[in-house]
Amino acid sequence: MNDTILINRLPTRTWNRLGVNETAIAWGQADDLGEEKITAAGQTERLEITGSGERGEKMVDIHAPAGQTVTVFETLRAEKGLLVRTALHVEKDAKVRLVQIQNAAQDSLLRLETSGECAENGQVELIQVLLGRGDVYSDGQFELNGNGAGFTAGIGYLGQKQQTVDMNLVVNHWGQKTTSEINAAGALKDDAQKIFRGTIDFKKGSAGSVGSEQETVLMLGDGVVNKTVPLILCAEENVVGNHGATIGELDEDTLFYFESRGISAAEAENIMARAAIEQLARTIEDEAAQAAILSELEEVL
């Protein structure tokens, strides 16, 4: 039996008519897929997380000891419903690099709940690659508790057909001189719909902190729906927060350029739709992950 649950809540509500305060989905009892605990400092861990039943739930706990770096790749293979909860614990002067790659079935529903806590000078680098199959709901909550803690996120997505891509990312600055940088980029085709909520919250006591967020969206169809919600909250005076969004279409000059080289409009759209994910893949600096991403792109486009 399914219940209706509310996920991806904005920390501060806005007008209900905008439809971005939270998202309601149908979800029920899920099979327990167990828990992974990772503390392998200085190494790269690779997890293949597969949900083959009606619904499955997986827990991943990542701990970076003081002064150490932990790198984890999660490949997420949802057949129907899959919830992956990943918790990051970053001690002083440590770093976690988490790369999440969606490789799901067409009619699947993938939920990502990713959270993190950073001590003094602790760092989190989050990379999410959402490859255009199935519905995706991603919720990230990160706490920069220690002075000098930092968070960066690179998110690349493709939405097509009747797909839903629904994202919520919240970074809370508690410590002094903390930093955050959020970059999201993607393309929407056919009748896809997407929400991106990005919140940077400067708490009282976070003096000297800096945060920025930027999203770039390419809209490739009259039926697509895009909602971009950048939000900066501030309870501290001596901080710097920036946000921006670039939303555009494939213009006639660009189409003419492609067509003059024998590339059809449909092929040109696919090339441009791939661009954000290909660019993000190059930053991963891991040949196996890059090859998997590019191979999946070839299948979906």
Question: Where do the model's predicted regions map?
Answer:
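Long, low-complexity, mixed-charge
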Residues: 1-46, 52
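Short cationic/low-complexity microdomains
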Residues: 18, 23, 28, 206-207, ...
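Conserved beta-strand/loop scaffold segments within soluble protein domains that form the structured core
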Residues: 30-256, 260-263, 284, 290-301
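Extended amphipathic alpha-helical segments enriched in small hydrophobics
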Residues: 255-279
